């Protein structure tokens, strides 16, 4: 747990463990990631809206490495079509480590970071994400979040409940957001997508793609 504690207070006032780096991805990088998304969304496990307590989410999700469904990770998408999700690519590990380095983590923390799953969410203009914690992972390693397309209002809260104190910030196309250490279990959500705010050349004309990299802490003998 202590390995991934970040003690610096970032200048944006989000508190220890959280960092927002605007325009971290270039337009070329964003466009390339959108091209990858077009491949991922087709399958072998196609993009879908997960159901939480019987209610379908407004965002649609496709996964790499491990398949996420509430409230577990499996290799096979037993809630979709029973197929195994694509492997987690090596370039995403390198991307995640570069994100941590740029967010202020130490060299030791960066080298120990080995994400093994990506949750890729697509938000249409009316989609939302309620306040929640990312706590289905065994590992306490940081979450790396990338935004592409339309900007959104991202609400980043506290670790105790969904209420105040929280901070609303705008995540634009190309932005990086990292949260770990004391902020790892902070409640967070998306209250609004801002239509027609995607920059020309990012590869996405409408909606928002959010890619989150995580370390599950899972092994194959602990999965379906």
Model-derived features with residue positions:
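Non-heme Fe(II) oxygenase metal-center motifs and adjacent flexible, charged/small-residue loops
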Residues: 1-224
């Amino acid at each position: 747990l202590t390995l991934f504690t970040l003690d610096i207070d970032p200048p944006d006032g989000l508190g220890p463990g959280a960092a927002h780096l605007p325009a971290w991805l270039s337009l070329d990088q964003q466009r390339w990631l959108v091209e990858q998304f077009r491949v991922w969304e087709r399958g072998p496990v196609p993009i879908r809206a997960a159901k939480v307590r019987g209610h379908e989410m407004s965002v649609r999700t496709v996964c790499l490495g491990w398949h996420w469904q509430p409230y577990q990770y499996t290799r096979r998408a037993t809630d979709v079509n029973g197929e195994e999700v694509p492997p987690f690519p090596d370039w995403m590990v390198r991307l995640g480590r570069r994100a941590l380095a740029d967010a202020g983590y130490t060299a030791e923390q960066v080298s120990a970071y080995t994400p093994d799953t990506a949750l890729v969410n697509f938000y249409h203009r009316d989609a939302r994400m309620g306040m929640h914690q990312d706590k289905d992972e065994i590992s306490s390693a940081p979450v790396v979040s990338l935004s592409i397309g339309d900007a959104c209002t991202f609400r980043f809260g506290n670790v105790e409940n969904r209420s105040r104190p929280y901070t609303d910030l705008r995540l634009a196309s190309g932005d990086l957001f990292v949260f770990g250490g004391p902020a790892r279990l902070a409640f967070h959500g998306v209250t609004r997508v801002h239509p027609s705010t995607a920059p020309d050349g990012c590869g996405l004309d409408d909606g928002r793609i959010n890619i989150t990299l995580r370390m599950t802490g899972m092994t194959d003998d602990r999965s379906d």
